[in-house]
Amino acid sequence: TASELKLATYSLDTAVDFDRRYAAKSRMDVVGKTFTRVAQEILLKQERTSATLLMTSLAGASTTSSTATGDKHIIANAIKGRFQLADINDLFTLAKRINSSWINGTPTTRTRGLTDIVTSPEIVANIRSMAYNPVNTKDFDNSRVGAGEFPLAGPEALRDELWRNAGLSSFMGLNILEYNEMGKGQKFNTLFATAAGGATYTSLTNSTNFAFSAAGTTDEIVVGIDRTRDSLIRAVATDAESGSEFNLIADDQYSIRQNKIGYFGSVEEGRVVLDNRVLVGCAVDYS
């Protein structure tokens, strides 16, 4: 049987021009750079559009089976200023709880719940530092660990793995997707901060909570994704004859202004999150 999905699409447009004298002098480097500019503008718009959808979906997601405060898909980190093993463990637990059956029981199809984390270079540095920093978040009496209270290092095998693989691309079975756009004050983080609107998040480990900064300059979000399920969809309109996705046309507004040559192009696409249960997050408090 065939099925169809209807979604709203939008056009991403770009236009460039250059002085006709460059073409007359066979300055192909100038002409080539205009094509590069066209591609860069479209890619930049696609990046921001996709990030806005992802961060907005995560910030607004809620599921009744979630163990996070307010049935949200986001938890807070356990230790201020640190992203620890406990936080990764809590993300796995949260993803499992979110993906319960419709009666909040065990689903017929069990998934890992989490396959990737999208994060900043600073969070990756936190992961690497587990090779030489304490990793415990609770004291021997099960209270929140404080400064100088019984610090425990990770297992020897774990620390050795982190030490030998400084440029690690995976950790605890999670693929690490490191982006410079993530992190305090960076554009993906500020998009999330705008969508979150100063929401408060709570740690599953020790029940501490904090309000995410409205500007996204003192806290950051770590995004967890389950890529075993096809829930993040990008649909692109293609030309019926050529199959091309991008349409580039000469700009006729320069027919009178003879000293300019220009062209414009556009791509029509649509993005949708079919099931926001594939998204979880950990808000890291640096305040």
Language-model segments: residues:
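Short, glycine/acidic-rich hinge or "gate" loops at secondary-structure transitions
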Residues: 31, 47-66
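Short, charged, low-complexity patches
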Residues: 27-35, 39
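Assembly/oligomerization interface modules of large self-assembling protein complexes
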Residues: 1-12
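Extended, solvent-exposed, turn-rich assembly/linker loops in the middle of proteins
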Residues: 60-167
